């Protein structure tokens, strides 16, 4: 196939293409204009074979044209030395030539399908070729562990691990600086950690060649090889600054046609500052060489960022809009209320004061904590006065005077119609206690409330009165006739009132007052 010319391959591919187009038109006419799909092509083995042959010829034509364009003095594939002659059985070369070749490599300007990582995340020194040579078994044939020189915190020098006291030796021992001849001997025997590109290029490696039309790698142009070796990925800040400084020094060393004194004075102090101490090398390069032609700065490719607003900013904006809308509505509502209030107000003179329409609200406080007692007038029977042994004339005159004065003092507290026998006789047991008759609970109580309540006697006074009444009168008084006394006692007696006694502080026995049953009082006390 290597001897075939590009024109022959193009003629064969054009003939196959014409046959395939004719079959596609016939298929579309037979199937109502439907185009042939992959399943339809697989059902026709002859057409499928033609499709495969056509794709093989197109890829072969492309590879041959690419080789002639980039490497016109290339050696034929048959004349190239084979890498492993013992591995290929006889006759396999012809069979491999007849087989379908692999897909041709993409051109240098084609877009890669999916990169493994972003170029900004790579170090320009860690190229794939360096890693492939570092971890290839052919490079470290005599090393026990090739990863020993690449991974680990152990200090190393020229691929050998340094001991604790190796740095103290100055006598040209194992730690002395190796010469060029020693380096040449060590490189082939021991594994080395690649430090620079030059060291990696000196590692001996067998040429990897394959038998077939795509045996060697695609030759790259000078610009592409430089970009891959020097600027494989986005350069770091330190490397880019170094490049700018080197270019600066090269431009500064060239003699300028008319150097001025100001330029010389400004260039001297800038050259004294080291590159790693300068703040911005790119700004310094632009200021010192405004018209110089140097390396254009390479734009650092960064990951795309979201240019628009974030979610929180959008939510906050919506909230602000809603609050502004609510504020406007509230202002309008307040204006309407103010207008209505102004229309409803009238003149103060035309308004009539209405006092009885709405009762004033009074907040209720604590209820009554003490029992309210409504005292009623108590009528007690008068006691009989003790008669002293004196002359009848004196007693009669005194009694008449006293009775007249006392009756004038308290006339309304005595019951009318009291018989004189009751005054002389022994009082009943009810005289010891206050009289509370059920008849007093009737409506007549309200009539008697107009009268001033009389002071009730205390318990000790009543006992004293009862004892004084029970005492038998002396025999002399009983033997004497008392017609005058009986006539005088028909009049109501006065009632003694103690001014210090209080009407509310006395024991009351209101048995039938608000009682639902015998013995159940207001608070349900047991008697």
Curated annotation (Swiss-Prot):
Keyword Cell cycle applies: yes
Biased composition (Basic residues): 361-375
Compositionally biased tracts (Low complexity): 180-191
Biased composition (Basic and acidic residues): 60-70, 246-255, 474-499
Gene Ontology molecular-function annotations: DNA replication origin binding; single-stranded DNA binding
Composition bias, Gly residues: 518-527
Alphabetical list of InterPro entries matching this protein: DNA_rep_checkpnt_protein (IPR021110), Sld2 (IPR040203)
Keyword Cell cycle: yes
Region (Disordered): 60-226, 244-303, 340-527
GO biological process terms held by the UniProt record: DNA replication initiation; double-strand break repair via break-induced replication; mitotic DNA replication preinitiation complex assembly
Cellular localization per UniProt: Cytoplasm; Nucleus
GO CC field: cytoplasm; DNA replication preinitiation complex
Compositional bias segments (type: Acidic residues): 391-407, 438-447
Polar residues bias: start-end ranges: 136-147, 279-291, 342-358
Pfam families xrefs: Drc1-Sld2
Keywords tagged on the record: Cell cycle, Cytoplasm, DNA replication, Nucleus
CDD domains tied to this protein: RecQL4_SLD2_NTD
Similarity remark: Belongs to the SLD2 family.
Functional note: Has a role in the initiation of DNA replication. Required at S-phase checkpoint.
Descriptive protein name: DNA replication regulator sld2
Name of the gene this protein is made from: sld2
């Amino acid at each position: 196939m290597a001897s075939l010319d590009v024109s022959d391959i193009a003629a064969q591919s054009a003939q196959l293409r014409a046959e395939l187009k004719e079959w596609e038109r016939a298929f579309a006419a037979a199937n109502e204009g439907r185009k042939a799909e992959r399943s339809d092509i697989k059902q026709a083995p002859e057409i499928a074979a033609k499709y495969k042959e056509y794709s093989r010829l197109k890829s072969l034509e492309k590879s041959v044209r690419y080789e002639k364009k980039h490497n016109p003095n290339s050696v034929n594939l048959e004349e190239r030395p084979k890498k492993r002659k013992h591995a290929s059985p006889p006759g396999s070369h012809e069979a491999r030539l007849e087989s379908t070749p692999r897909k041709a490599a993409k051109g240098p300007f084609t877009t890669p399908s999916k990169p493994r990582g972003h170029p900004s995340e790579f170090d320009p020194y860690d190229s794939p070729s360096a890693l492939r040579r570092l971890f290839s078994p052919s490079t470290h044939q005599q090393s026990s562990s090739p990863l020993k020189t690449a991974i680990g915190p152990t200090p190393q020098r020229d691929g050998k691990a340094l001991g604790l006291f190796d740095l103290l030796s100055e006598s040209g021992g194992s730690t002395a600086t190796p010469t060029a001849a020693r380096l040449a001997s060590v490189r082939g025997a021991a594994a080395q950690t690649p430090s620079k590109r030059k060291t990696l290029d000196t590692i001996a490696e067998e040429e990897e060649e394959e038998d077939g039309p795509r045996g060697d790698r695609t030759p790259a142009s000078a610009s592409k090889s430089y970009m891959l070796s020097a600027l494989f990925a986005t350069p770091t800040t330190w490397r880019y600054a170094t490049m700018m400084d080197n270019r600066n020094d090269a431009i500064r060393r060239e003699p300028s046609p008319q150097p001025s004194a100001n330029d010389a004075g400004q260039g001297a102090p800038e050259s004294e500052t080291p590159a790693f101490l300068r703040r911005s090398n790119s700004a310094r390069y632009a200021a010192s060489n405004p018209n110089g032609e140097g390396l254009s700065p390479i734009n650092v490719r960064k990951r795309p960022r979201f240019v628009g607003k974030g979610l929180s900013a959008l939510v906050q904006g919506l909230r602000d809009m809603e609050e502004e809308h609510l504020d406007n509505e509230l202002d309008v509502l307040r204006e309407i209320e103010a207008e209505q209030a102004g229309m409803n107000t009238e003149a103060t003179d035309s308004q009539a004061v209405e006092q009885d329409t709405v009762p004033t609200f009074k907040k209720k406080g604590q209820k009554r904590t003490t029992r309210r007692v409504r005292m009623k007038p108590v009528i007690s029977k008068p006691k009989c006065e003790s008669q002293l042994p004196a002359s009848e004339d004196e007693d009669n005159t005194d009694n008449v005077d006293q009775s007249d004065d006392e009756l004038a003092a308290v006339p309304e507290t005595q019951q009318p119609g009291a018989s004189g026998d009751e005054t002389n006789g022994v009082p009943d047991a009810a005289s010891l206690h206050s009289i509370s008759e059920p008849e007093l609970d009737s409506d007549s109580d309200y009539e008697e409330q107009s009268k001033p309540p009389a002071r009730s006697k205390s318990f000790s006074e009543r006992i004293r009165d009862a004892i004084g009444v029970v005492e038998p009168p002396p025999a002399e008084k009983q033997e004497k006739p008392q017609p005058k006394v009986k006539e005088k006692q028909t009049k109501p007696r006065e009632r003694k009132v103690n001014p210090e006694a209080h009407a509310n502080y006395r024991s009351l026995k209101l048995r039938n007052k608000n009682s639902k049953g015998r013995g159940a009082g207001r608070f349900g006390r047991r008697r």
